[in-house]
Amino acid sequence: MARVAVICPDLLFGSNVEGALRAAGHEVTRYDDAAGVDSPDVLVVDLNEVDAAPLPGVPSVGFYRHTDVDTRRRAEDAGYDMVVPRSRMARETAALVERALLR
């Protein structure tokens, strides 16, 4: 079980991400922005809604709207470990977080 910080102000999508991670046995804390995020094992960020840099030493998964190539590039340049389209995040939430933990 990992402590996962999910920064996603979208109530519906954030709840889906949180539910999938809890079902996989992870402890999840949701945030609307980066303020207050405190030493998680993994960071998950909605890149279209939040301007949050990855945390040093913390595996990070960012997701974006598939049409927003600029956001993907900025996240990769910022150092996110994994940057995936929102649709993939919806399908593979737990698997992506577990893969990030292996990095």
Residue spans for each PLM region:
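Short, structured coil segments at secondary-structure junctions
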Residues: 24, 56, 78-80
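A short, hydrophobic beta-strand element within the central beta-sheet of small alpha/beta folds
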Residues: 58-67
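Active-site beta3 strand of CheY-like receiver
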Residues: 39-46
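Short, polar loop motifs at secondary-structure junctions
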Residues: 11-12, 31-35, 47-51, 67-68
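Short, charged N-terminal beta->alpha structural module
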Residues: 1-32
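Output/docking surface of receiver
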Residues: 79-91
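Receiver (REC) domain switch/output surface
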Residues: 95-103
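Alpha4 helix (beta4-alpha4-beta5 surface) of REC/receiver domains from two-component response regulators
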Residues: 67-82
